[in-house]
């Protein structure tokens, strides 16, 4: 069984409010990684992100900071063109205080460009999570395994796959794909079966080889998320 870090997702509006800081501090013992989502801003800039990071850095000794721009194609709010999205991700490397950066994977990506950006981020000591999200369904087992395989070829620190289950077999397939990957590949793996049906994938992540599990601070930011305080308590049972 692997050690699992708990990620708390936040989606602030305009700036980091003191009430949000208080909510984070109230759950500080449950948070290993704080995920700052930035796709909710219509035209987010690197300067805006840097300002938010500065506000959060006061607490940074307590957790790592992950920055994510989730595109609309993969279930987020972000409507940047692909080029604008990749330029933003690349520019995040220059912000001190960011520990981890999420970059999305799609079957039709420019492989060489993606690899250049990932290598660039790593040269600035950013851990990379390459991720893929399917909010409609769970592909068959062999396709799940293939997606994990394709993502790990970029040599990221983490590969993350989140899918929507429609029955218990979908959940089992995701867990099996994650378990097999963790036994055979070097990089860390994250597998999420979304919604209440797939909650076990969040709470028992480490049993199946997963390294990160995502929770919320108050209102869920994705289907099936629970508050990080409850999630931490569940994860430590295994």
From Swiss-Prot:
<keyword id="KW-0057">Aromatic amino acid biosynthesis</keyword>
<keyword id="KW-0456">Lyase</keyword>
<comment type="function">
    <text>Involved in the third step of the chorismate pathway, which leads to the biosynthesis of aromatic amino acids. Catalyzes the cis-dehydration of 3-dehydroquinate (DHQ) and introduces the first double bond of the aromatic ring to yield 3-dehydroshikimate.</text>
</comment>
<dbReference type="InterPro" id="IPR001381">
    <property type="entry name" value="DHquinase_I"/>
</dbReference>
<keyword id="KW-0028">Amino-acid biosynthesis</keyword>
<dbReference type="GO" id="GO:0008652">
    <property type="term" value="P:amino acid biosynthetic process"/>
</dbReference>
<feature type="binding site">
    <location>
        <position position="70"/>
    </location>
    <ligand>
        <name>3-dehydroquinate</name>
    </ligand>
</feature>
<comment type="pathway">
    <text>Metabolic intermediate biosynthesis; chorismate biosynthesis; chorismate from D-erythrose 4-phosphate and phosphoenolpyruvate: step 3/7.</text>
</comment>
<dbReference type="InterPro" id="IPR013785">
    <property type="entry name" value="Aldolase_TIM"/>
</dbReference>
<keyword id="KW-0704">Schiff base</keyword>
<protein>
    <recommendedName>
        <fullName>3-dehydroquinate dehydratase</fullName>
        <ecNumber>4.2.1.10</ecNumber>
    </recommendedName>
</protein>
<dbReference type="InterPro" id="IPR050146">
    <property type="entry name" value="Type-I_3-dehydroquinase"/>
</dbReference>
<comment type="similarity">
    <text>Belongs to the type-I 3-dehydroquinase family.</text>
</comment>
<dbReference type="GO" id="GO:0009073">
    <property type="term" value="P:aromatic amino acid family biosynthetic process"/>
</dbReference>
<dbReference type="GO" id="GO:0009423">
    <property type="term" value="P:chorismate biosynthetic process"/>
</dbReference>
<feature type="active site" description="Schiff-base intermediate with substrate">
    <location>
        <position position="160"/>
    </location>
</feature>
<comment type="subunit">
    <text>Homodimer.</text>
</comment>
<feature type="binding site">
    <location>
        <position position="225"/>
    </location>
    <ligand>
        <name>3-dehydroquinate</name>
    </ligand>
</feature>
<dbReference type="GO" id="GO:0046279">
    <property type="term" value="P:3,4-dihydroxybenzoate biosynthetic process"/>
</dbReference>
<feature type="binding site">
    <location>
        <position position="202"/>
    </location>
    <ligand>
        <name>3-dehydroquinate</name>
    </ligand>
</feature>
<dbReference type="GO" id="GO:0003855">
    <property type="term" value="F:3-dehydroquinate dehydratase activity"/>
</dbReference>
<dbReference type="Pfam" id="PF01487">
    <property type="entry name" value="DHquinase_I"/>
</dbReference>
<feature type="binding site">
    <location>
        <begin position="35"/>
        <end position="37"/>
    </location>
    <ligand>
        <name>3-dehydroquinate</name>
    </ligand>
</feature>
<feature type="active site" description="Proton donor/acceptor">
    <location>
        <position position="133"/>
    </location>
</feature>
């Amino acid at each position: 069984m692997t050690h699992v870090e708990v990620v708390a997702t936040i989606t602030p509006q305009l700036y980091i409010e003191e009430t949000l800081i208080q909510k984070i501090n109230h759950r500080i013992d449950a948070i290993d990684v704080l995920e700052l989502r930035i796709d909710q801003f219509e035209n987010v800039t690197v300067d805006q992100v840097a300002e938010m990071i500065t506000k959060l850095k006061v607490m940074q000794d307590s957790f790592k900071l992950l920055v994510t721009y989730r595109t609309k194609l993969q279930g987020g709010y972000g409507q940047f063109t692909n080029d604008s999205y990749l330029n933003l991700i690349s520019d995040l490397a220059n912000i001190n205080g960011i520990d981890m950066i999420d970059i999305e994977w799609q079957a039709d990506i420019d492989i060489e460009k993606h690899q250049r950006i990932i290598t660039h981020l790593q040269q600035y000591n950013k851990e990379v999570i390459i991720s893929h999200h399917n909010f409609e369904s769970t592909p068959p087992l062999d396709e799940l395994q293939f997606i994990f395989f394709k993502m790990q070829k970029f040599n990221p620190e983490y590969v993350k796959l989140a899918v929507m289950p429609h029955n218990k077999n979908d959940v089992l397939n995701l867990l099996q794909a994650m378990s097999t990957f963790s036994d055979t590949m070097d990089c860390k793996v994250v597998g999420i079966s979304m919604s209440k049906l797939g909650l076990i994938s969040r709470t028992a992540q480490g049993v199946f080889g997963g390294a990160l599990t995502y929770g919320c601070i108050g209102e869920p930011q994705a289907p099936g998320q629970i508050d990080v305080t409850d999630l931490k308590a569940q994860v430590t049972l295994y």
